[in-house]
């Protein structure tokens, strides 16, 4: 097993937890497994209807470091207002809406997450190659939410989860008033830590984001358990914000010169 590292940052992100259309299109407070697996499948050119093609991603383990949770933003959104009925939004029955469709869409503004993707070596290599030259471009939950660069921080590391604790620069302001060599940072893990270890005390939460099918007419997800922890991260990773981009680029390029 090995892995890669992704940095999910941008002006807006939106990680839907429900596949059904509802008046309020909510976002989860962190990247969902469904969205990330969908990103990998799209990068590899796997069609939405290819349910069998998703099986290999069952081997993937995802760990999310919450560098900055962002601010919840809600967009008031209308479709089809001010037009004759034949030009308004279509219905499932083949007709058209009588008036504008009103929805509210939630986003995370200015959020930053770093994701450790752990998988068998061959799958890690396939994912890294696809994310460097994707068949369909990656986005942060919705197509309008493009990721900032650097996006793919490392294509191959032996222990990507350890890099979240000791290697990847942290998007956090300098903490001049906090003593000690570490900073408390929130993580989301797919398996619990060893009892007694740093951050082992976890909140277990139930989420419905295990993708079964992305078929446009038969989307399906299963529930799973996620472990939310607060863990000590090396304070050295939270350097001056004015040098953050340089430090991120240096970290990403260090792999090429190793």
Give the residues covered by each predicted segment:
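Internal, well-folded beta-alpha domain core
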Residues: 66-258
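Short, surface-exposed beta-edge/turn micro-motifs
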Residues: 1, 61, 110-114
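Glycine/small-residue-rich interface belts in oligomeric ring/scaffold proteins
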Residues: 2, 17-87
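Peripheral peptide segments
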Residues: 1-2, 214
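Short amphipathic
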Residues: 3-8
């Amino acid at each position: 097993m090995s892995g890669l590292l992704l940095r999910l940052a941008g002006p807006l992100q939106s990680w839907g937890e429900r596949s059904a259309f509802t008046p309020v299109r909510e976002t989860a407070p962190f990247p969902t497994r469904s969205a990330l697996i969908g990103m990998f499948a799209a990068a590899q050119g796997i069609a939405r209807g290819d349910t069998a093609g998703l099986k290999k991603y069952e081997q993937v383990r995802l760990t999310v470091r919450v560098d900055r949770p962002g601010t919840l933003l809600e967009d008031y959104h209308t479709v089809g207002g001010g037009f004759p009925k034949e030009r308004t939004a279509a219905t499932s029955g083949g007709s058209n809406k009588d008036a504008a469709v009103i929805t509210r869409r939630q986003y995370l503004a200015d959020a930053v997450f770093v994701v450790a993707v752990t998988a068998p070596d061959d799958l890690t290599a396939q994912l890294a190659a696809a994310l460097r030259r994707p068949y369909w471009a990656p986005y942060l939950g919705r197509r309008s939410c493009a990721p900032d660069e650097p996006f793919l921080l490392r294509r191959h590391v032996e222990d990507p989860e350890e890099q979240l604790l000791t290697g990847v620069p942290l998007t956090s302001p300098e903490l001049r008033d906090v003593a000690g060599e570490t900073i408390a940072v929130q993580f989301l893990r797919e398996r619990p830590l060893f009892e007694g270890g740093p951050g082992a005390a976890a909140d277990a939460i139930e989420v419905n984001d295990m993708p079964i099918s992305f078929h446009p007419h038969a989307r399906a997800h299963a529930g799973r358990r996620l472990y939310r922890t607060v863990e000590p991260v090396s304070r050295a990773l939270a350097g001056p914000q004015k040098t953050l981009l340089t430090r991120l680029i240096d970290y990403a390029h260090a792999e090429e010169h190793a």
